[in-house]
């Protein structure tokens, strides 16, 4: 995912990482912990949003982590779902069909996104309520 983040940033895309885990969840990160993990994992997102109350996640219907959302230049949802077509952890993710990269590429070319929604995969979001 970091390679896709870096690629997107090079195209001027704003990449927001939203942590909707409740404060009592093992997945919750405060700002200092998140920053440390960003550095260790070489995360290239534009910004991190602490959504511990889950308002943003619930607004978008976020079910898993990751659950990807691509918003177009007008602020409309253009794609949502999995980052790619490989839910299993084995294998090279660079060989997967990357739905997020495809959506961004099509939007930048003013084209039509072929796959606008897929089923996200990963661990369930642990909302506080």
Q: What do the predicted segments below correspond to?
A:
Residues 24, 47, 90:
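Short, flexible active-site loop motifs that bind/organize anionic cofactors or intermediates
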Residues 5-8, 41, 60, 108-112, ...:
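Sec/Tat-exported extracytoplasmic proteins
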Residues 70-129:
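Thiol-/selenol-based redox modules, centered on thioredoxin-like
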Residues 16, 35-72, 77-78:
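Short, internal strand/loop/helix patches
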Residues 1-40, 52-58:
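Structural microenvironment flanking redox-active thiols in thiol-disulfide oxidoreductases
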Residues 32, 40-41, 88, 107:
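Generic preference for well-ordered secondary structure
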């Amino acid at each position: 995912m970091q390679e896709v983040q870096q690629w997107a940033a090079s195209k001027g895309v704003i990449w927001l990482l939203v942590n909707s885990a409740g404060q009592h969840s093992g997945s919750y990160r405060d700002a200092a912990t998140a920053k440390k993990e960003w550095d260790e994992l070489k995360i290239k997102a534009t910004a991190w949003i602490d959504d511990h109350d889950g308002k943003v996640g619930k607004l978008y219907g976020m079910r898993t982590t990751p659950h990807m959302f691509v918003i177009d230049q007008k602020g409309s949802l253009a794609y949502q779902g999995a980052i790619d077509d490989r839910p299993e952890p084995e294998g090279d993710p660079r060989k997967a069909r990357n739905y997020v990269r495809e959506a961004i590429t099509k939007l930048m070319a003013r084209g039509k996104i072929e796959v606008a929604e897929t089923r996200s995969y990963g661990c369930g979001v642990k909302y506080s309520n």
